[in-house]
């Protein structure tokens, strides 16, 4: 991490790290064929795992769902506190074209870790919508977190609160729409019948 903070996530710093831990070139290639990119991904997964363990041990039952998510997101964000510059450099590296698919995958993995840790058991479309929404919330809050010099992160906390409120408002509106349209014809079923040649 010290090398990354100064020189960024590059193949050169990967080679320095490899030599620091005494890993052969062959073993390093097997472990991280994409060198620094695979190292970033491994680091993110490690932070997910660390945060997940803390979240699971918390008294989640005493919290409302909004409080659980806020707590869980903050626990994950705190994992980068020791290496904020490395996290900034990782974010910059993930913006390059060869990492186009990595950033969204890592955000999704973080969101999945958080939802599972707080006890989410959804398996339907909600499984995907929850993770997609939380990925956006976490990603934007991480940017706010890393851009704030104050170690207490008051602006990032406030930003997270606003984002989660937006999500809660959306879910409330979605619930109202679901109730309003409950008695309408099932369009999906109708289309399915048409597709398979069944009459209405």
State the predicted function of each range:
Residues 1-26, 34-41, 45:
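Short, amphipathic alpha-helix enriched in basic
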Residues 31-61, 65-67:
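Conserved alpha-helical segments that form or flank metal/cofactor-binding pockets of metalloenzymes
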Residues 54-89:
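Hydrophobic alpha-helical connector segments
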Residues 65-79, 106, 110-117, 163:
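C-terminal ligand-sensing/allosteric alpha-helical core of TetR-family HTH transcriptional regulators
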Residues 75-110:
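Internal, conserved structured core segments that host functional sites
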Residues 98-120, 130-135, 139:
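Amphipathic alpha-helical packing segments from all-alpha helical-bundle domains
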Residues 120-182:
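Hydrophobic/aromatic-rich alpha-helical bundle segments in the mid-to-C-terminal region
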Residues 173-200:
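Long, charge-rich low-complexity segments
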